[in-house]
Amino acid sequence: MQIFPAIDLKNGQCVRLFQGDFSKKTVVNEDPIAQAKAFATDGATYLHIVDLDGALEGRPINLEVIQKMKITAKIPVQVGGGIRSMAQVDYYLESGIDRVIIGSAALTDPDFLRAAVQKYGAKIAAGIDAKNGFVATRGWLDVSQVSYLDLAKRMEKVGVETIIYTDISRDGTLTGPNLEQMANLKEHVKVNLIASGGVSSRADLEALAQLGLYGAIAGKALYNHHISMSDIVEVEQIAY
C-alpha cells in the first residue's frame, strides 16, 4: 500500500486542521520546502499536498512553493485544492506535478472532470470529502445531499482511476480511519482508493492495508510522532 505523508499549505506554511475547521489551525512547520525534503530523506516515496488557500479561493495560490517542494523532494507529488479549470490542471501537470486532485469540481462540474480524465488519464484523481456520509465542497464549507458512495460510482463511470476519500469528521482527530466506509467503497467501486482522515497509529495503517486499498494518507499522526517514517516504510513493504 502506498502511504502519502500529507502537507497542507496555508499562508505559505505547513498546517494541520481539526475536522476541516480553518479556525482550528496549527502550524506544524513554517518551511514547507524543508518539510517535503525531510519526508523524502526519511523514506517517503510520494507526497500528498493540499493548497488550503486554493481550496477557499477556487484557484491555485501556492503554485510556486509547490513546484519548489517537488524539485527539492525529488519524489512524486499529488496536489489538490482549488483546481477547478482545465487551465489549472494543465499548469500543474506541465510544471512537473505527477497527479492532480479534482475535489469540489468533481461534484459541481462533472463535464470538467470528464474532460480532464479524457486528456490526462491516470494523472487525474477525484477527491471525495464527506461529512456524515454526504459530500462536502468548497474547502469543506458546504455539505451537499449527495452520498459519498453515489459520487464514487459516478467518478468510476467517468473513467477516474484514483479516488481519495476523506472522512471530514475524523480528519486531524487521531481517532482512527473510517474502516467501514472504506470497506464499503472497496466493495462497490473498482478504482484505486486512497483513505484520508483519522489515521493515528501504525495499527491504523495496517488495518487500511488489510482492506486491500491502494493507498492511505498520514498527516497529524506524523507531525505528532504517533507514526514514524520508518513505520510508513515498513508498512508499505508488507504484502496483505
Swiss-Prot record:
Q: In which pathway does it act?
A: Amino-acid biosynthesis; L-histidine biosynthesis; L-histidine from 5-phospho-alpha-D-ribose 1-diphosphate: step 4/9
Q: What is its main location?
A: cytoplasm
Which domain of life does this protein belong to? Bacteria
According to its UniProt record, where is this protein located?
Cytoplasm
EC identifiers of the protein: 5.3.1.16
Q: Name one GO biological process term.
A: L-histidine biosynthetic process
Q: Which reaction does it catalyse?
A: 1-(5-phospho-beta-D-ribosyl)-5-[(5-phospho-beta-D-ribosylamino)methylideneamino]imidazole-4-carboxamide = 5-[(5-phospho-1-deoxy-D-ribulos-1-ylimino)methylamino]-1-(5-phospho-beta-D-ribosyl)imidazole-4-carboxamide
Q: Which UniProt keywords apply?
A: Amino-acid biosynthesis, Cytoplasm, Histidine biosynthesis, Isomerase
Q: What cellular component terms from Gene Ontology apply here?
A: cytoplasm
Record-annotated active site: D8 (proton acceptor), D129 (proton donor)
Record GO terms (molecular function): 1-(5-phosphoribosyl)-5-[(5-phosphoribosylamino)methylideneamino]imidazole-4-carboxamide isomerase activity
Under InterPro entries, the record lists: Aldolase_TIM, His_biosynth, HisA_bact_arch, Isoase_HisA-like, Isoase_HisA-like_bact, RibuloseP-bd_barrel
What SUPFAM superfamilies does the database record attribute to this sequence? Ribulose-phoshate binding barrel
| One Pfam family from the record | His_biosynth
Q: Which Gene3D superfamilies match?
A: Aldolase class I
Q: Which family does it belong to?
A: Belongs to the HisA/HisF family.
The protein's name? 1-(5-phosphoribosyl)-5-[(5-phosphoribosylamino)methylideneamino] imidazole-4-carboxamide isomerase
